[in-house]
Amino acid sequence: GVLLGYYADNVKLIPLAMKILRDNVGCPLEFASELLRLERIHRESGLPSSITALVISDSPARRDIFAEAIRQRRQLDISWDIRLSDRDILITIMPLHGDAAVTGYLLRTQRWLQEMFNATKFMDAKVTPYTALVNERPAEELLTNLLERCLVRQA
């Protein structure tokens, strides 16, 4: 029952996910599908989910910070790593977690930035965090807005 429902859900989401993939080169299918699934879950049950983005600007520690951010991922999170010439971006979907989980994630990130890179604030490490809640807004629009805020897409 559960596996069949999950499979049927995936089949329904594929066309919508393909549109997200066409509009966002490099976006993993798993990321797009999970975002759409969580949008539906929120619409049907009101359960929150969140997305965070860490934009790591060019600095001598940029590659090390990005690598550590990837290592710090939680097991259930789904991520999209974007590598650009002047910055790296780690976008993380936090399924079924709202504001409190985002706050905890950002505090943990700030703590390891301080411990490992001696950066007391995000801006000391040239890291800019962005967050978004999965809500009534269509998943594609939510992602587009987040990418615009991260300066990946033009508004």
What are these regions, as identified by a protein language model?
Residues 14-26, 126-133, 152-155:
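Flexible, glycine/charge-rich interdomain/linker segments that couple
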Residues 34-57:
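Active-site-proximal structural segments of metal-dependent nucleotidyl cyclase/transferase enzymes
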Residues 22-41, 61-66, 101, 105:
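Interdomain coupling helix/linker and adjacent catalytic-core signature
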Residues 2, 6, 37, 65-68, ...:
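Long, highly charged amphipathic alpha-helices
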Residues 59-60, 66-101, 110-123:
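Conserved helix-loop-beta segment at the catalytic/binding core of cyclic-nucleotide signaling proteins
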Residues 47, 61-68, 100-104, 133-155:
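Catalytic cores and conserved motifs of cyclic dinucleotide signaling enzymes
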Residues 1-18:
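Signal-transmission/dimerization alpha-helices at domain junctions
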Residues 50, 80-96, 118-150:
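A short glycine-enriched loop-to-beta-strand structural element that forms part of the catalytic core
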